[in-house]
Design a protein with these regions (language model features):
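Long, terminal "pre-/pro-" and other extracytoplasmic accessory regions
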Residues: 1-147
């Protein structure tokens, strides 16, 4: 799957890909998150459907391939992003007792004309769920999985 996607210009996070087999074991579905510059695009998934060893269908959202299409501006550092997260949690009344993982990622926004931008985000995994802070504006972002 990964080699095929690379041939068509799509990088994926193979370590987090999910494979689901049919009850007979004759078919399977592979779903993976796309990458841009090594960072996951959290709302950009690609799915490959196989029957036996034959690829039947590729579906999902094709990520941008041009670095100039990513959002411009300087990204905030991790300490600033954590402070924004704490302020958001406090303002929202969420009770969070631990942050279990922090990482960089992107969110892809596509307009009706087909053009799009990649917005850098900080992703915080906590004991109450994942939260995303815009890496440029510091605002909380809502991420919906596209497939």
């Amino acid at each position: 799957s990964e080699n095929f996607l690379k041939k068509i210009g799509i990088d994926i996070d193979a370590d987090t890909a999910q494979v689901k087999y049919s009850s007979s074991g004759a078919s399977c579905t592979v779903t993976a998150m796309c990458l841009f510059e090594g960072r996951p695009i959290v709302n950009c998934l690609v799915t490959l459907n196989y029957s036996d060893t034959n690829l039947l269908l590729v579906s999902g959202t094709r990520p941008l391939t041009d670095a100039s299409e990513s959002a411009s501006g300087s990204e905030m550092d991790a300490a600033t992003a954590v402070m924004r997260l704490i302020a958001m949690l406090d303002d929202s009344g969420y009770l969070c007792s631990s942050i279990t993982d922090v990482g960089h990622c992107y969110k892809m926004d596509v307009s009706a004309s087909g053009t799009g931008t990649l917005t850098p985000l900080w992703r915080f995994s906590t004991d109450i769920g994942d939260f995303y802070i815009n890496g440029i504006t510091g605002k909380t972002e809502t991420v919906t999985q596209n497939n």
